[in-house]
């Protein structure tokens, strides 16, 4: 009888679905609605979905039961996917994302650095296929605001070709090559 061990790269069945997207649950909150007859308990879930190649989406779901809330959040995340320009598993340049009181600073990192980021940001980077990045959360630590601030920052990432076209210069002038 052999003992099977689970490596860090092995995906759980609920993490990879048939469509090839990676899913991560960021947070689940128990919420209460107070009515005349008492309290109604429910759950709110925040999830992120990515393809491992630069696309990522976030979704929120609410329900009276956790699995339904998570499923609703996953479905919304799949519908709200956005594409981010990556280079060798990291960003092209440093960027700051903002949402509400949350600010997120993201900086490209050299090969072998890994993902140095806190909870909600780490989940986003793992599902979208970023392997080397330095990120810091400034201000609010609310997971919803951090996820939105991270996506705001990622939407600001531009390739050297995009910057060159905007400035009317060649790519070599922009990259300094």
UniProtKB/Swiss-Prot annotation:
GO molecular function: rRNA binding; structural constituent of ribosome
Stored SUPFAM superfamilies: dsRNA-binding domain-like, Ribosomal protein S5 domain 2-like
PROSITE patterns in alphabetical order: RIBOSOMAL_S5 (PS00585), S5_DSRBD (PS50881)
Domain S5 DRBM: 21-84
GO terms under cellular component: small ribosomal subunit
Keywords: Ribonucleoprotein, Ribosomal protein, RNA-binding, rRNA-binding
Pfam families, A to Z: Ribosomal_S5 (PF00333), Ribosomal_S5_C (PF03719)
GO biological process, one term: translation
UniProt comment concerning the protein's domains: The N-terminal domain interacts with the head of the 30S subunit; the C-terminal domain interacts with the body and contacts protein S4. The interaction surface between S4 and S5 is involved in control of translational fidelity.
Subunit structure: Part of the 30S ribosomal subunit. Contacts proteins S4 and S8.
Family, as annotated: Belongs to the universal ribosomal protein uS5 family.
Function, as annotated: With S4 and S12 plays an important role in translational accuracy. Located at the back of the 30S subunit body where it stabilizes the conformation of the head with respect to the body.
Protein name, as recorded: Small ribosomal subunit protein uS5
């Amino acid at each position: 009888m052999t003992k099977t061990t689970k490596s860090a790269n092995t995906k759980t069945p609920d993490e990879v679905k048939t469509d090839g997207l990676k899913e991560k649950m960021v947070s689940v909150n128990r919420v209460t609605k107070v009515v005349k007859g008492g309290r109604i308990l429910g759950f709110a879930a925040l999830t992120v979905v990515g393809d491992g190649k630069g696309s990522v989406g976030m979704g929120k779901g609410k329900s009276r039961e956790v699995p339904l809330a998570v499923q609703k959040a996953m479905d919304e995340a799949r519908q709200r996917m956005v594409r981010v320009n990556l280079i060798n598993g990291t960003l092209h340049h440093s960027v700051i994302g903002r949402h509400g009181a949350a600010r997120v600073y993201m900086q490209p990192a050299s090969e072998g650095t890994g993902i140095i980021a806190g909870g909600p940001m780490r989940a986003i980077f793992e599902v979208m296929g970023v392997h080397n990045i330095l990120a810091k959360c400034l201000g609010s630590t609310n997971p919803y605001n951090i996820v939105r601030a991270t996506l705001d920052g990622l939407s600001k990432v531009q390739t050297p070709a995009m910057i060159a076209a905007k400035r009317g210069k060649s790519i070599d002038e922009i990259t300094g090559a």
